[in-house]
From Swiss-Prot:
Organism: Gallus gallus (Chicken)
Main location: membrane
Lipid group attachment sites (S-palmitoyl cysteine): 3, 5
Protein name: Proto-oncogene tyrosine-protein kinase LCK
Binding site for ATP: 250-258, 272
Length: 508
């Protein structure tokens, strides 16, 4: 079907692309319909049905997208992209969409996170579509951003409205983020202060980039963002060992080593190779098939496996490594209590998802939390502890058994539930606020067991807010059913400081 709009042809053309701006259909260069309709008798009421005329435009207009980044095809059937190239989406299925280039006419699969809707705000470097207030703060406070870095996001509470988030420096709080409501006008415009109104968000950004005019600071550069990693190719699950190249050893754990490497020479991944005999390959594959379906922004993504021993687990690569190690670095040791609690809230969010899926982690601690370049925390190794066939790990007397993180009922009776994960989360909170200190400092594992049986609980760490310590103590209730849910702890941690400060800055 071609363009069926009756409008000025010269104004309908997008530069270098034969697409009608009104209906998004291609305009046939040889078609007589390109000619300007001047004859009044040919003007037709669009609401009236006429016989012998071309079929009307589909009410579901084509979905046109623009490439945000270059993409080199690496698979059979995917389509290369050039930044700024426009495409028509033919089918949305999972993380790879079938599309047709409006430049070349070629069809193929494209990564959904490399494109954005044409004629929308999504291609703008300062616009972040689905971003919460907390995540906006985390992004803006991440390394690479400076005073005045900003973003505009969709409002969490008011559909169709937006919020402006700006990085600022406060004498009392240090680096902080200020939020401003962008209010909608009846005529379609926007304003932060009613003194100055704008017909578009682009105008608003341009204005406050040249003058703060009541904001905490003039807008600087848009919030830094990284080119996303393309989604894992849909058919690659059990992969040959030869497709992996181990490049840099990141660490060695109780069950094997972790490497940074590449899959098929182009996709950066983390590769965990398990010691032979540490678990049954068949049991691992069954568990891995469950794990790969647990997909959430706060869980490390499981990409693929090598199921012949030595078993390889291929996951997304997290630049900052484990949380316990990161907290001890020169960057980690400088994190404010606000940022530490934000990290705790992120972990609680991931565990709330695991809780909702009736799954159990079994080995929740800072060593099994990974940190991205933007300081986003993700939960790793969920479910693997159950498969370990090493008595040093599975027996409570074993040297590898994580006594200090394990709930009493799991130590004594091997009873692991989501409530034993809650206990472990309380211990993890102490690791976070002490910048990676080992729990129960100065105690051996047998001493920890004896003290727990007598009702001992760790004292409040230095610089730990009283309310946070009270949450820890709830996690360490003797009766598992009395411990809080992760969903509850997520809401408490996300709103920890919000209750005592304004949600938004006053109108300038």
């Amino acid at each position: 079907m071609g363009c069926c709009c009756s409008s000025d042809y010269d104004e309908d053309w997008i530069e270098n692309i034969d697409i009608c701006e009104h209906c998004n259909y291609p305009i046939d260069p040889d078609s007589k319909r390109q000619q300007l309709i001047r004859n009044v008798s040919e003007v037709r009421d669009p609401l009236v049905s006429y016989e012998a005329m071309s079929p009307p435009c589909s009410p579901l207009q084509d979905k046109l997208v623009v490439a945000l980044y270059d993409y080199e095809p690496t698979h059979d059937g995917d389509l290369g992209l050039k930044q700024g190239e426009k495409l028509r989406v033919l089918e949305e299925s999972g993380e790879w969409w079938r599309a047709q280039s409006l430049t070349t006419g070629q069809e193929g699969l494209i990564p959904h996170n490399f494109v954005a809707m044409v004629n929308s705000l999504e291609p703008e470097p300062w616009f972040f579509k689905n971003l919460s207030r907390k995540n906006a703060e985390a992004r803006l406070l991440a390394s690479g951003n400076t005073h005045g870095s900003f973003l505009i996001r969709e409002s969490e509470t008011s559909k169709g409205s937006y919020s402006l988030s700006v990085r600022d420096f406060d004498q009392n709080q240090g680096e902080t983020v200020k939020h401003y409501k962008i209010r909608n006008m009846d005529n379609g415009g926007y304003y932060i202060s009613p003194r100055v109104t704008f017909s578009s968000l682009h105008e608003l950004v341009e204005y406050y980039s040249s003058s703060s005019d009541g904001l905490c600071t003039r807008l600087g550069k848009p919030c830094r963002t990284q080119k996303p990693q393309k989604p894992w190719w849909q058919d690659e699950w059990e992969v040959p060992r030869e497709s992996l190249k181990l490049v840099e050893k990141l660490g060695a754990g109780q069950f094997g080593e972790v490497w940074m490497g590449f899959y098929n020479g182009h996709t950066k991944v983390a590769i965990k190779n398990l010691k032979q005999g540490s678990m049954s390959p068949s049991a691992f594959l069954a568990e891995a098939n469950l794990m790969k379906n647990l997909q959430h922004p706060r869980l490390v993504r499981l990409y693929a496996v090598v199921t012949k021993e030595p078993i390889y687990i291929i996951t997304e690569y997290m630049e900052k490594g484990s949380l316990v190690d990161f907290l001890k670095t020169s960057e980690g040791i400088k994190l404010s209590i606000n940022k530490l609690l934000d990290m705790a809230a992120q972990i609680a969010e991931g565990m709330a998802f695991i809780e909702a899926k009736n799954y159990i982690h079994r080995d929740l601690r800072a060593a099994n939390i990974l940190v991205s370049e933007a300081l986003c925390c993700k939960i790793a190794d969920f479910g693997l502890a159950r498969l370990i066939e090493d008595n040093e790990y599975t027996a409570r007397e074993g040297a590898k058994f994580p006594i200090k993180w394990t709930a009493p009922e799991a130590i004594n009776y091997g009873t692991f539930t989501i409530k034993s994960d809650v206990w472990s989360f309380g211990i993890l909170l102490t690791e976070i606020v002490t910048y990676g200190r080992i729990p129960y400092p100065g105690m051996t594992n047998p001493e920890v067991i004896q003290n727990l049986e007598r009702g001992y609980r760790m004292p409040q760490p230095d610089n730990c807010p009283q309310e946070l310590y009270e949450l820890m103590m709830q996690c360490w209730k003797e009766q598992p059913e009395e411990r809080p849910t992760f969903e509850y702890m997520k809401s408490v941690l996300e709103d920890f400081f919000t209750a005592t400060e304004g949600q938004y800055q006053q109108q300038p």
